[in-house]
Regions:
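Acidic, glycine-rich loop-and-beta core segments that form the ion-binding/anion-interacting portion
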Residues: 114-190
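Short, charged, surface-exposed secondary-structure boundary motifs
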Residues: 103-108, 163-165, 205-210
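Gly/Ser/Thr-enriched, mixed-charge loops and adjacent short helices
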Residues: 14-127
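General beta-strand structural signal in soluble alpha/beta enzymes
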Residues: 71, 95-96, 134-135, 152-154, ...
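Phosphate-binding and adjacent anionic-ligand microenvironments
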Residues: 9, 15, 167-326, 332
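Gly/Ser/Thr-rich active-site loops/lids in small-molecule metabolic enzymes
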Residues: 22, 95-97, 150-169, 202, ...
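Single conserved hydrophobic/aromatic residue that forms the stacking wall/gate
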Residues: 1-21
């Protein structure tokens, strides 16, 4: 059922495939078809890095107090270590779907889709938890639900994380994708940081972080890349623990903490199914022909139109046959 949404991520020399990903993927495809692989004479050995990873987290994360946490692993890979780790960093941990099951019997492990957070919301409200954390299928993304059971979209928790970094390191650079709220950019600037908007996609975010030596990066899908105090890759468990660390220094509830970053009237990602050829034609025609007065056009990835109090966005998905849209305004 989920096969169309699965895939393989390639990295070259610790980087994503970057702006020339299409050419690089086609070259890899050709090598695979020709069975052209390098053959070494080394030895293969099995090693576990579980304890080394846990030790690294223990070294990097310091909590002033422990919170009551609900963790939804979505039956994904985060089920292996997630409960053990979050239990150590929580006053009380309520586990949801923390057994690996690739058929995903409870919900699809995509925290960017609000319907996949319904069980987490119910559990947070039932147990009166401080925060709910959802991991995606491979554990590199996260979704957040506050103490009132409200979904906190990634650009809002990126705002909190950005503020935390900028309180310690002024003029740090923060990378985010074109789907993020203007509130994030304003938060970064308010706290004397340097906002960098880039294309949507793991490879593009990672490339911009490396090019600009940015302290933090993230996108609306829930990928968070900590380059300050971590290793610059997207890690849902570390990002979740970092959130707990930030919240542990607050006397306010999680809901009150996020109220500092107002939730504008906005949509989640809206996906319109189409075919791969047509989606790029639509974007090309819009860029060339749709130029409404009073709006600033940003075309680094699809088309983003920014007005004085609102913006709208459309792009062609790189990974699925669909168009992706999002809208935001100060009023409804």
């Amino acid at each position: 059922f989920f096969q169309a949404e699965d895939g393989i991520r390639y990295c070259l020399l610790s980087r994503g495939l970057g702006d020339v990903y299409k050419r690089q993927i086609l070259l890899l495809k050709k090598r695979i078809e020709n069975n052209h692989f390098l053959a070494g004479k080394g030895k293969l050995s099995d090693q576990s890095f579980d304890q080394k990873y846990i030790d690294a987290l223990n070294e990097k994360i310091t909590l002033k107090k422990k919170l009551k946490v609900v963790l939804d692993c979505g039956n994904g890979a985060g089920s292996v270590l997630g409960p053990t780790i979050f239990k150590k960093f929580s006053d009380e941990l309520i586990e949801l779907f923390c057994k690996v099951d690739g058929s995903f019997p409870n919900h699809h492990p995509d925290p960017s889709d609000p319907k996949n957070l319904s069980d987490l919301i119910k559990a947070v409200e039932l147990h009166k938890a401080d925060v709910g954390i959802a991991l995606d299928g491979d554990g590199d993304r996260l979704g957040i639900v506050d103490s009132d059971g409200e979904i906190i979209y990634p650009d809002r928790y990126l705002s909190l994380m950005s503020k935390d970094i900028l309180e310690r390191y002024k003029k740090s650079k923060i990378v985010f994708d074109v789907k993020c709220s203007n509130q994030l950019k304003q938060t970064i600037e308010k706290h004397k940081g340097i906002p960098i908007m880039t294309k949507t996609g793991h490879s593009f975010i990672k490339s911009e972080i490396k090019k600009n030596n940015a302290a933090l990066g993230g996108e609306m899908s829930g990928h968070i890349f900590y380059n300050e105090g971590w290793y610059g890759f997207d890690d849902g468990i570390f990002s979740g623990l970092k959130l707990l660390e930030i919240l542990s220094n607050q006397e306010k509830t999680t809901h009150e903490v996020f109220n500092e970053f107002p939730n504008m009237f906005n949509t989640p990602e809206i996906k319109i199914s189409t075919d791969d050829k047509y989606k790029f034609e639509v974007i090309s025609k819009l860029k060339n022909n749709f130029k409404p007065e009073g709006f600033n056009a940003i075309t680094i990835d699809g088309l983003r139109l920014e007005g004085p109090r609102s913006w709208g966005f459309i792009r062609a998905s790189n990974t699925t046959p669909s168009l992706v849209l999002r809208f935001e305004a100060e009023t409804n």
